Amino acid sequence: MKICIVSFTKKGYELSCDIAYKLEQSAYEVEVFTKCSRLSDENIKNSTDENFRNSGYISQNISDWTAARMSEKKALIFIGACGIAVRAIASSVNNKLKDSPVIVIDELGKFVIPILSGHVGGAN
């Protein structure tokens, strides 16, 4: 399964990298992105593993970015507020049997909420 992790703060980005490393150990293909304007592409490049493909700063609108990933059938992990994820996926939700799995994790990594394609898509 191909997974995209997106964060919105530096702390969220650090958690994204930790999660990505663990998922890569389980043979998942993981991409790490952030919308945190305090992190430059150079900082992101230096702090991530070489195996994280297509990682970097998201300059486009988060809804457009999310729609593109969902059209590629990639699972999404949002690190941050559930409301951000819900708004980002809203225009791309079509069919519970075909939608990409989407989960939200708080910045501390304590709570995980599957918000789309839980049973069928594998988010649970």
Which residue ranges define each predicted feature?
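N-terminal basic/disordered segments at the start of proteins
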Residues: 1-38
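Active-site and donor-binding regions of nucleotide-sugar-utilizing enzymes
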Residues: 85-86, 114
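Short, glycine-/small-residue-rich phosphate/pyrophosphate-handling segment
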Residues: 110-124
